[in-house]
């Protein structure tokens, strides 16, 4: 917090011999304090500006009060031309090494927990995707097997019908009898194939 001014050349000259404050008959204590403050040089934060003269706000208030009591024509703002508020450099306290180490440990723990959480979500998603693809593969294979079974069933029934129709020409001379015999044989073969196909499908469903 600011508590002093960087005195400008105007204030320094006013307090010197023959200066503007000489006719104002400053109290001895106030003059001594002002001269001591202006005579003491402080090193500022900026080395290029050189030594700096610091005057506390209390001395400035006392000077202002004295000028008002004397009804002086010399105003304080005129004396403070070129002066600036002095803001001391804030010195940061050293950090506690134990506290710093503890904070770093907490950061590492939080980072590890976050990494585990992210990787756990990714693993779960991969597992779900893998299970879905596996189920889809099983369904495709089952559908393929079903299509092949139906195709084999149709081919077998048609083959039984054709073979019976062609072979029955040596037994029956009429076409109607030959067709009827072929239908009977094809039906029997179809029922047998259908029975085998149903049992096979039941076995596959039991495995699923």
Curated annotation (Swiss-Prot):
GO terms for cellular component: COPI-coated vesicle membrane; endomembrane system; endoplasmic reticulum; endoplasmic reticulum membrane; endoplasmic reticulum-Golgi intermediate compartment membrane; lysosome; vacuolar proton-transporting V-type ATPase complex. The chain crosses the membrane at residues 146-166, 179-199. It is found in: Cytoplasmic vesicle, COPI-coated vesicle membrane; Endoplasmic reticulum-Golgi intermediate compartment membrane; Endoplasmic reticulum membrane. Pfam families: Vma12 (PF11712). It is a multi-pass membrane protein. One of its GO terms (biological process) is cellular response to increased oxygen levels. The modification N-acetylalanine is found at residue 2. GO terms for molecular function: oxysterol binding. Keywords: Acetylation, Congenital disorder of glycosylation, Cytoplasmic vesicle, Disease variant, Endoplasmic reticulum, Membrane, Transmembrane, Transmembrane helix. PANTHER family: TRANSMEMBRANE PROTEIN 199. It is linked to Congenital disorder of glycosylation 2P: A form of congenital disorder of glycosylation, a genetically heterogeneous group of autosomal recessive, multisystem disorders caused by a defect in glycoprotein biosynthesis and characterized by under-glycosylated serum glycoproteins. Congenital disorders of glycosylation result in a wide variety of clinical features, such as defects in the nervous system development, psychomotor retardation, dysmorphic features, hypotonia, coagulation disorders, and immunodeficiency. Accessory component of the multisubunit proton-transporting vacuolar (V)-ATPase protein pump. Accessory component of the proton-transporting vacuolar (V)-ATPase protein pump involved in intracellular iron homeostasis. In aerobic conditions, required for intracellular iron homeostasis, thus triggering the activity of Fe(2+) prolyl hydroxylase (PHD) enzymes, and leading to HIF1A hydroxylation and subsequent proteasomal degradation. Necessary for endolysosomal acidification and lysosomal degradation. May be involved in Golgi homeostasis. Binds 20(S)-hydroxycholesterol (20(S)-OHC). This is Vacuolar ATPase assembly protein VMA12. It comes from Homo sapiens (Human). The gene is VMA12.
């Amino acid at each position: 917090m600011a508590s002093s001014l960087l005195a400008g050349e105007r204030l320094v000259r006013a307090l010197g011999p023959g200066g503007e404050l000489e006719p104002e008959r400053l109290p001895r204590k106030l003059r001594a304090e002002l001269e001591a403050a202006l005579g003491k040089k402080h090193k500022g934060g900026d080395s290029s500006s050189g030594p700096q003269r610091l005057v506390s706000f209390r001395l400035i208030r006392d000077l202002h009060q004295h000028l008002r009591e004397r009804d002086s024509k010399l105003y304080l703002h005129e004396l403070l031309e070129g002066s600036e508020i002095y803001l001391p450099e804030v010195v940061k306290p050293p950090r506690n090494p134990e506290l710093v180490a503890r904070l770093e440990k907490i950061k590492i723990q939080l980072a590890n927990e976050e990494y585990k959480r992210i990787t756990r979500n990714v693993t779960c998603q991969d597992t779900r995707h893998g299970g879905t693809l596996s189920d889809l593969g099983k369904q495709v294979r089952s559908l393929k097997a079903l299509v092949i079974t139906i195709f084999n069933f149709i081919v077998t029934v048609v083959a039984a019908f054709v073979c019976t129709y062609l072979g029955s020409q040596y037994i029956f001379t009429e076409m109607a009898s030959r067709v009827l015999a072929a239908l009977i044989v094809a039906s029997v073969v179809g029922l047998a194939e259908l029975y085998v196909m149903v049992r096979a499908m039941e076995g596959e469903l039991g495995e699923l």
